[in-house]
Amino acid sequence: MIRMSVLYPATEGHVFDHDHYRDRHVPLALRTWGPKQAEIDKGVDGPYVAAVHFRFDSLEAMTAALSGEGSTQVTADVANYTNITPVVQISEIV
């Protein structure tokens, strides 16, 4: 099982619309990429404003999903909710 975590660092002057992220962006990513599971974190304290963790069956499944045509739409939507450049971590769940 592979987990792709997308983390949004709390940077000076950051903007992050949690409602848009929860209600529009993550559902768009779910429809487009079809992961097995997704969890959203809303940062309360610490170095990150928000994060999402997607689970895929395999690295190949994740790569195929992210390479699809709809990924352009998912990426374009980022500007609608934040000015933060996210950090992406790909992990194998052991």
Give names to the regions the model predicted:
Residues 1-94:
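Macromolecular interaction modules
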